[in-house]
């Protein structure tokens, strides 16, 4: 749903820019000028790449639907620069929860529980909003989650997350179908979660957000497996994250290996020089 909204917004903006132009004026040069203007808006390279990809899909649909030649084959989508997610240190994790858990109000405990579930169970933002009370199994420490396409999966519930949930349930004045609610008792929305995440991000000296919390879960899941078992189960992680394609999950294998190698690196020079 969010992806469709984003797609519509991008193409609505593009369409409003070229409505006054005749079809004959919509050339490769026109596209280049428009795409360059995106950089003038101070958008990141990754965002511009997303804009161009969505616009190209829209134009290809117009070509087929209205039998037009909009030269879409000449539109080159730039590759998004790949950036490894920041893996939080123990100190940074303490900073995050110290900011959220300023008091023992039910709203503070709610926010702690949401962040904890993203960080320790790998929930997406929308999955946290849609989590039902009946799908939380405290005794077995399991959550039933409905992900993209309403696909059901089970994810682990850590001790800290369980404690936050128990304290939140005990203090929340509302007892509803969904686990997390707003001040008025209604189901919490993605915008509400995004708002408090943005407020937190503004107070932290490092990158923070729901996607980064999920990335941290995935990377640390593999690192912990390696430290405990000497191997990493990519398919177990795929199941927990709700991915359909193992290639999506494999990026975390690469990141986890980087972290493991960097922390266990044996310096040849140190050995020679006696350090």
Language-model features and meaning:
Residues 1-275:
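Conserved catalytic core of the tyrosine transesterase superfamily
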């Amino acid at each position: 749903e969010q992806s469709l909204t984003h797609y519509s917004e991008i193409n609505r903006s593009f369409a409003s820019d070229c409505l006054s132009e005749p079809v004959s004026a919509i050339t490769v040069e026109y596209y280049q000028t428009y795409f360059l203007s995106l950089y003038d808006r101070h958008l990141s390279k990754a965002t511009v790449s997303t804009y161009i990809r969505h616009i190209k899909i829209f134009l290809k649909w117009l070509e087929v639907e209205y039998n037009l030649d909009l030269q879409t084959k000449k539109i080159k989508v730039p590759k998004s620069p790949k950036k490894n997610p920041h893996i939080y240190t123990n100190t940074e994790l303490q900073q995050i929860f110290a900011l959220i858990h300023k008091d023992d109000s039910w709203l503070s405990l709610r926010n702690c529980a949401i962040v904890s579930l993203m960080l320790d169970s790998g929930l997406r933002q929308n999955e946290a909003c849609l989590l039902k009370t009946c799908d939380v199994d405290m005794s077995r420490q399991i959550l039933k989650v409905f992900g993209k396409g309403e696909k059901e999966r089970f994810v682990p519930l850590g001790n800290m997350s369980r404690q936050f949930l128990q304290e939140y349930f005990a203090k929340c004045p509302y007892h509803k179908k969904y686990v997390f609610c707003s001040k008025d008792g209604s189901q919490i929305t993605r915008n509400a979660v995004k708002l408090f995440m943005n407020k937190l991000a503004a107070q932290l000296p490092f990158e923070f957000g729901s996607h980064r919390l999920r990335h941290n879960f995935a990377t640390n899941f593999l690192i912990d497996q390696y430290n405990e078992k000497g191997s990493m189960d990519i398919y177990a992680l795929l199941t927990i994250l709700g991915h359909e394609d193992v290639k999506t999950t494999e990026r975390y294998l690469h990141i986890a290996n980087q972290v493991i190698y960097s922390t266990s690196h044996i310096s040849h020079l140190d050995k020679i020089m006696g350090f």
